[in-house]
Amino acid sequence: MNDVAIVKEGWLHKRGEYIKTWRPRYFLLKNDGTFIGYKERPQDLEQRESPLNNFSVAQCQLMKTERPRPNTFIIRCLQWTTVIERTFHVETPEEREEWTTAIQTVADGLKRQEEETMDFRSGSPGENSGAEEMEVSLAKPKHRVTMNDFEYLKLLGKGTFGKVILVKEKATGRYYAMKILKKEVIVAKDEVAHTLTENRVLQNSRHPFLTALKYSFQTHDRLCFVMEYANGGELFFHLSRERVFSEDRARFYGAEIVSALDYLHSEKEVVYRDLKLENLMLDKDGHIKITDFGLCKEGIKDGATMKTFCGTPEYLAPEVLEDNDYGRAVDWWGLGVVMYEMMCGRLPFYNQDHEKLFELILMEEIRFPRTLSPEAKSLLSGLLKKDPKQRLGGGSEDAKEIMQHRFFASIVWQDVYEKKLSPPFKPQVTSETDTRYFDEEFTAQMITITPPDQDDSMEGVDSERRPHFPQFSYSASATA
């Protein structure tokens, strides 16, 4: 019954996600939903264990189209925490029909199995998934937090999905950053899973260089994260002003980032995946705070890989562009890019034309300013290796390999974690409402928030059961 059998196999043309070329891939569809692709037809078991593409057709939607090529079909499914789309084409309508029928049959079979398992498990809470266990075990806040519990002081930032506002909690007088996301935009842009991931990761993470979550709650049309407020500003803001950081300053920030990523990888089995200067903040004392967990992957162990696309183009690792499976090493590529920016004052690869940019990331050798020390060059060369298996931190030792690099020879890692190192720059903030390190384009704006509806003042059972955002509410004090 548990034997995994191949349902269908053969050649398909697969379209790249970023570099929109069609690549021939030999795909195997298995009855457990696995849909794996290879450059060549695998001849033995060893070759089968290293696929280039690894998808699941569970809960998928299939669409047939004649664009951009005849006999195209698109698979859309939720994978890990993100909705993904993969585009394939074959030579004839008959071939397409065979593939789509086989995929739909496997997906339907898995759905039936899941429904049977759910029936069998009802009344047995110990069998639930980790995410469900976590949500059930969260203590509910005694007082339901709502938008009326805060004063709205200044706009700190604005994006596609919503805004970030400096708020003051009326009951305690404490200051927080409130991230307010519009549900309709999140749903329209397939960001539901990313957003729920951010909520889960923030709830479960306790580390000095990760932004702490105080509360999360929802209204009928918004999701709200009330987070620790780091008013030292974005690292991007400071680097833009100073153009380049000294190696000592870059080493300090780099060490704190490595400490946080090590915690996420080893303690939480999470890959951050979106490391960039804009997601690195400074607190009032000048220590790093990593923000914005919307692109995190959950459940990544050593050797585990993932298949979804997101991230800023300039920071994308080669294995992501190549449309290959990727794992924790993407974070070390991201670290390489941000540390290169800090020490060299520019991105390692840049072109306004995305196709040319991707070509540079995949093919171009890294270049360094003459002023860079041999240790810094060695570190950056290791972190920016194109092959993730050869990359510094790409092996089973993960962060430990980077910690042992000679660039960090002077660093005592326990002292980093305990914040015993003096920050090389202390933000000159005079109060908690001082926003001098935030862009005036935002802070000078009037805050406009549509008043919550009457029924939003109490987040009732119905809102908690909404299909897109179940069990969203959280209070750190209730779980402390």
Curated annotation (Swiss-Prot):
Gene3D superfamilies, sorted: Phosphorylase Kinase, domain 1 (3.30.200.20), Pleckstrin-homology domain (PH domain)/Phosphotyrosine-binding domain (PTB) (2.30.29.30), Transferase(Phosphotransferase) domain 1 (1.10.510.10)
Glycyl lysine isopeptide (Lys-Gly) (interchain with G-Cter in ubiquitin) crosslink, residue number(s): K284
Annotated residues for binding of ATP: L156, G157, K158, G159, T160, F161, G162, K163, V164, K179
Top EC class of this enzyme: transferase
Localization annotation: Cytoplasm; Nucleus; Cell membrane; Mitochondrion intermembrane space
Chain spans, region Disordered: 450-480
Family statement drawn from the similarity comment of this UniProt entry: Belongs to the protein kinase superfamily. AGC Ser/Thr protein kinase family. RAC subfamily.
Sequence positions bearing Phosphoserine: S124, S129, S473, S477
Job description of the protein: AKT1 is one of 3 closely related serine/threonine-protein kinases (AKT1, AKT2 and AKT3) called the AKT kinase, and which regulate many processes including metabolism, proliferation, cell survival, growth and angiogenesis. This is mediated through serine and/or threonine phosphorylation of a range of downstream substrates. Over 100 substrate candidates have been reported so far, but for most of them, no isoform specificity has been reported.
Record flagged with keyword Mitochondrion: yes
Record text on subunit structure and interactions: Interacts (via the C-terminus) with CCDC88A (via its C-terminus) and THEM4 (via its C-terminus). Interacts with AKTIP. Interacts (via PH domain) with MTCP1, TCL1A and TCL1B. Interacts with TRAF6. Interacts with GRB10; the interaction leads to GRB10 phosphorylation thus promoting YWHAE binding. Interacts with RARA; the interaction phosphorylates RARA and represses its transactivation activity. Interacts with MAP3K5 and TNK2. Interacts with BAD, CLK2, PPP2R5B, STK3 and STK4. Interacts (via PH domain) with SIRT1. Interacts with SRPK2 in a phosphorylation-dependent manner. Interacts with RAF1.
Record has Manganese as a keyword: no
Domain Protein kinase intervals: 150-408
Domain notes: Binding of the PH domain to phosphatidylinositol 3,4,5-trisphosphate (PI(3,4,5)P3) following phosphatidylinositol 3-kinase alpha (PIK3CA) activity results in its targeting to the plasma membrane. PI(3,4,5)P3 is also required for phosphorylation at Thr-308 and subsequent activation. The PH domain mediates interaction with TNK2 and Tyr-176 is also essential for this interaction.
Catalyzed reactions: L-seryl-[protein] + ATP = O-phospho-L-seryl-[protein] + ADP + H(+); L-threonyl-[protein] + ATP = O-phospho-L-threonyl-[protein] + ADP + H(+)
Name of this protein: RAC-alpha serine/threonine-protein kinase
Species this chain originates from: Bos taurus
Annotated keywords: Acetylation, Apoptosis, ATP-binding, Carbohydrate metabolism, Cell membrane, Cytoplasm, Developmental protein, Disulfide bond, Glucose metabolism, Glycogen biosynthesis, Glycogen metabolism, Glycoprotein, Isopeptide bond, Kinase, Membrane, Mitochondrion, Neurogenesis, Nucleotide-binding, Nucleus, Phosphoprotein, Serine/threonine-protein kinase, Sugar transport, Transferase, Translation regulation, Transport, Ubl conjugation
GO cellular component, one term: cytoplasm
Glycosylation sites (chain numbering): S129, T305, T312, S473
Post-translational modification (record): O-GlcNAcylation at Thr-305 and Thr-312 inhibits activating phosphorylation at Thr-308 via disrupting the interaction between AKT1 and PDPK1. O-GlcNAcylation at Ser-473 also probably interferes with phosphorylation at this site. Phosphorylation on Thr-308, Ser-473 and Tyr-474 is required for full activity. Phosphorylation of the activation loop at Thr-308 by PDPK1/PDK1 is a prerequisite for full activation. Phosphorylation by mTORC2 in response to growth factors plays a key role in AKT1 activation: mTORC2 phosphorylates different sites depending on the context, such as Thr-450, Ser-473, Ser-477 or Thr-479, thereby facilitating subsequent phosphorylation of the activation loop by PDPK1/PDK1. Phosphorylation at Ser-473 by mTORC2 promotes ubiquitination and degradation by the proteasome.
Listed InterPro entries: AGC-kinase_C, Akt1, Kinase-like_dom_sf, PH-like_dom_sf, PH_domain, PH_PKB, Pkinase_C, Prot_kinase_dom
Disulphide connectivity of cysteines: C60-C77, C296-C310
EC annotation from Swiss-Prot or TrEMBL: 2.7.11.1
Catalytic residues as annotated in Swiss-Prot or TrEMBL: D274 (proton acceptor)
